[in-house]
Amino acid sequence: MGAIDTETKAYLSNPEHFCDVFNFWLYKGRQVICVDDLKELDTTAIALPYGVDAKEPIQKFRDVLKLYTAMQDNRAIYLMLGIEAQTETHYAMPVRNMLYDAMSYTKQIAEAAVSYRKGEEKLPKAEYLSGFRREDRLMPVITLTISFSPEPWDGSTSLHEMLAVDDNEILQYVADYKLNLLTPHDIADEDFDKFRSEFGTVLECVKHRQDDDMKWMEGKERFKGVTRQTASLIKTVTGFNLDLSEEGDVVNMVNAWENGLNKARNDARAEGRNECRRDMMTAIRMIKENKPTKVIREQTGLSEQNLIELRSML
């Protein structure tokens, strides 16, 4: 797993950030899902193969998966919420997420079957073979893909879009799977205010990653003090040359940006001076070896006037 994958997964595993993502996606920023309503779930999913030729089980690992419990009309409502982070377009994402969701449903049925077989109640034959009772219900699974690219998602967003047929008479009999997709490119600048955690700040930086200046950052209070973890993630996923040497747990993004640019300019000047010095030393050595002027110029990039001045000094 790469550095970006590791860092984004750790950041999204934070319950505060996780809640913020789904409150934005499901409720347009309304604070419905709370940290206390979440429970960590095992991100490992195993799908048992079917058929006589079946061999090894399929094992997949989700990025983040949590159980959401809420009360609605005096009864408990359960949702399984999963997040998949992508730094680039995954052109098979609808099938990939469909598999994750199917394995989550399969696991629920398998767990129900185990509990019934351990229980004392004798089930009717059909329910016993199914491992599932007629009145049983599954917990819904919602998987959200989050893009960390400033570019628009140019892949399929549904299973039907991936199929090699566009005949509606056929497609109406083919089950579809729609991708839940959150991309910074498609978020209006004013909608980043709907995020209550710093995750919105991360996505806004991703959206403007290719901008030539920082005007989009000016005048926004949230950029004046972000946690070091958030600043580090922004630097990782955007490639911004941020200077995070400032002490303390809070980073002023505007200062970090400006200091990073100044440091880059100074480093470039220093490197330019060092490179010029190296070229001069090479030219002096080649002059002493009586190398032709044309060869010296080609290797060092120095002008003919530079070489005349060097020769006069030797």
Stretches with model-predicted labels:
Residues 77-87, 182, 197-314:
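Short, charged alpha-helical interaction segments and adjacent helix-coil junctions
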Residues 1-193:
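Accessory alpha/beta interaction modules
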